[in-house]
Structures are given as structure tokens and as C-alpha cells.
Curated annotation (Swiss-Prot):
It comes from Prochlorococcus marinus (strain MIT 9211). This is Small ribosomal subunit protein uS7. Belongs to the universal ribosomal protein uS7 family. Keywords: Ribonucleoprotein, Ribosomal protein, RNA-binding, rRNA-binding, tRNA-binding. Part of the 30S ribosomal subunit. Contacts proteins S9 and S11. One of the primary rRNA binding proteins, it binds directly to 16S rRNA where it nucleates assembly of the head domain of the 30S subunit. Is located at the subunit interface close to the decoding center, probably blocks exit of the E-site tRNA. The gene is rpsG. PANTHER family: RIBOSOMAL PROTEIN S7. GO terms for biological process: translation. InterPro entries: Ribosomal_uS7 (IPR000235), Ribosomal_uS7_bac/org-type (IPR005717), Ribosomal_uS7_CS (IPR020606), Ribosomal_uS7_dom (IPR023798), Ribosomal_uS7_dom_sf (IPR036823). Gene3D superfamilies: Ribosomal protein S7 domain.
Length: 156
């Protein structure tokens, strides 16, 4: 491990188009090969589709989707005396949000659909309605933590 000081966390600035921090984080997760404008266009198009289909505010729906996909606990591997235990641990809010965004993007990419904007819009609408793969992944993570509750005393 490095002996230097840990890098300072830079503040996430709100997205210029939507004036929302989560939107900035989502653009960063969507971006491939440094193509930020493409990622911004995908998110903007997805929000347009959401507004078209539901008639509600896409930013509100997006925030609900992220909240519904955010895990509260996770399991982490811990070696104790030659055995590896899956130890349930609480997830910090920042990490939980990052995990939710990662899952939303990954499951959007693996969906069937025309464009990435269509796939992302579909996944966000599903997550906002407590359905979809990202929410299922959160439930799975919570079940794993519940099943391994006996090893909670190994927390570090």
C-alpha cells in the first residue's frame, strides 16, 4: 500500500444541462473512451424518452430509480484462520450510489433494444417502479448479507 497521503476526493459538480449531481455521476458511468458529449446525449435522450412515455419529471424518476437500486448492506470476503467468510457490512451512502449507477448502466447495456438511450430509459423506469435487473441485484445483495448475518462479528 502507498505510504503517501490518500488522494483528496474532488467534489462532484452539478450537470450543466440538468443541474443535478447524480446526472454528472451517471454521465461519467456512461462514458466510454472519454466521449463525454456522447454520454451526455445518451442521458439527455433517455430523459426525453422517459418524459414522453410517463409524462412525469425525468429527473425525479431518475432519482427514485437510483434510490431504489441503492444497496444498504453488502458482503465482503474476510479471511480468518484459513477460512474465507462472507462478512455483511453496511454500505456508505457514496459507495451505495456509485454501485446503483454502475448496476443501472451495466444492466442497461445488456438489455435488448434499439439504442442505448432506449435501453437506459427502460432500465430507469423499471427501477423507479421497483422492478428491473438493478433492483433485483440490490435484493440479491441484501439476501446474501442476511444469509451471512452469523459472520457479522468479523466486521473490520
Amino acid at each position: 500500500m502507498s505510504r503517501r497521503n490518500a488522494a483528496e476526493k474532488r467534489p462532484v459538480l452539478p450537470d450543466p444541462q440538468f443541474n443535478n449531481r447524480l446526472a454528472t455521476m451517471m454521465v461519467a458511468r456512461l462514458m466510454k473512451h472519454g466521449k463525454k458529449s456522447t454520454a451526455q446525449r445518451i442521458l439527455s435522450d433517455a430523459f426525453g424518452l422517459i418524459n414522453e412515455r410517463t409524462g412525469s419529471d425525468p429527473i425525479e424518476l431518475f432519482e427514485t430509480a437510483v434510490k431504489n437500486a441503492t444497496p444498504l448492506v453488502e458482503v465482503r470476503a474476510r479471511r480468518v484462520g484459513g477460512a474465507t467468510y462472507q462478512v455483511p457490512m453496511e454500505v456508505r451512502q457514496e459507495r451505495g450510489t456509485a454501485m446503483a449507477l454502475r448496476w443501472l448502466v451495466n444492466f442497461s447495456r445488456s438489455r435488448n433494444g434499439r439504442s442505448m438511450a432506449h435501453k437506459l430509459a427502460g432500465e430507469l423506469m423499471d427501477a423507479a417502479n421497483e422492478a428491473g435487473n438493478a433492483v433485483r441485484k440490490r435484493e440479491e445483495t441484501h439476501k446474501m448479507a442476511e444469509a451471512n448475518k452469523a459472520f457479522a462479528h468479523y466486521r473490520y
